[in-house]
């Protein structure tokens, strides 16, 4: 009887271990491809700036199966928005899930308004087969440049938002490792900005084109004033990108 119980326990532990090994997160190192390149085209309409188009690109280097670093850039025409960022990531496997800790430095240049926006963000990202959740904090600084000396006594040249909460939730209809997938997301950030209560929601997808290449995209809606203290505009945008590993 005891031998049978021991055998059952061993079988359960073995099956649990195997089950935990079958899941591989979308940001994990596969043991072969250390270099990752993402290129994205985007376009949309904003009630403040009108129509806009742009592009972004990100390079990621997996240093180990736990540590990675990345750098990216973005250009949005008509908005005259130019962005740069660097990020370091640590991955902590938790059974069948992954927990990522991200530290990020971001710089936005709003040339149309002569404003610089440096951002520091620290966040944790939990990823399962069907659900992903991000929580964190940002420090956002807005700085108006080129203000004439005679106006500086009564003109605000900048201000800081020291505690900008980062939150996001995504849900997939199929396992994340499936060759194709559809999902919904709800968050207060995008690739190159973080805002307090300016909510984004939309639809996302990905489709594997070949073992080293994946097509992905998002349709993103920002309703003006939706549980928001800051937003005064309404925006819709569409992204289409390629994810390539080598």
Task: Locate the predicted segments by residue.
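Transmembrane beta-strands of outer-membrane beta-barrel pores
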Residues: 41-47, 53, 73-79, 92, ...
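Predominantly the C-terminal beta-signal and adjacent terminal strand-loop region
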Residues: 195-246
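Short glycine/proline- and aromatic-enriched beta-strand/turn motifs that initiate or cap beta-hairpins
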Residues: 19-76
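Hydrophobic h-region of N-terminal signal peptides that target proteins for export
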Residues: 11-20
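Detector for outer-membrane/organellar transmembrane beta-barrel domains
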Residues: 117-191
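Residues that define the transmembrane beta-barrel architecture of outer-membrane proteins
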Residues: 35, 49-55, 80-84, 114-120, ...
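Residues on the lipid-exposed face of transmembrane beta-strands in outer-membrane beta-barrel proteins
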Residues: 43, 55-61, 73, 86-90, ...
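Repeated loop/turn-to-beta-strand initiation elements of outer-membrane beta-barrel proteins
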Residues: 35-36, 65-70, 93-101, 129-135, ...
């Amino acid at each position: 009887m005891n031998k049978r119980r021991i055998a059952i326990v061993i079988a359960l532990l073995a099956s649990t271990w195997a089950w935990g090994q079958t899941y591989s997160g979308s940001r994990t190192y596969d043991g072969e491809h250390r270099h990752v390149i993402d290129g994205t085209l985007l376009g949309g309409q904003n009630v403040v700036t009108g129509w806009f188009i742009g592009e972004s690109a990100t390079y990621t280097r997996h240093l180990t199966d736990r540590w990675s670093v990345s750098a990216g850039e973005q250009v949005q025409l008509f908005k005259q928005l130019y962005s740069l960022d660097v990020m370091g990531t640590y991955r902590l496997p938790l059974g069948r899930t992954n927990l990522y800790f991200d530290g990020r430095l971001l710089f936005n240049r709003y040339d149309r308004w002569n404003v610089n926006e440096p951002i520091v963000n620290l966040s944790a990202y939990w990823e399962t087969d069907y659900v992903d959740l991000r929580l964190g904090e940002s420090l956002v600084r807005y700085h108006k440049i080129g203000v004439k000396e005679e106006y500086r006594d009564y003109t605000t040249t900048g201000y800081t938002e020291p505690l900008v909460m980062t939150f996001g939730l995504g849900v997939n209809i199929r396992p994340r490792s499936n060759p194709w997938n559809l999902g919904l997301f709800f968050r207060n950030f995008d690739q190159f900005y973080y805002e307090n209560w300016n909510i984004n929601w939309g639809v996302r997808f990905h489709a594997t084109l070949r073992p080293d290449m994946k097509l992905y995209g998002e349709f993103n809606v920002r309703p003006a004033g939706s549980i928001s203290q800051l937003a005064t505009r309404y925006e819709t945008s569409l992204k289409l990108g390629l994810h390539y590993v080598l």
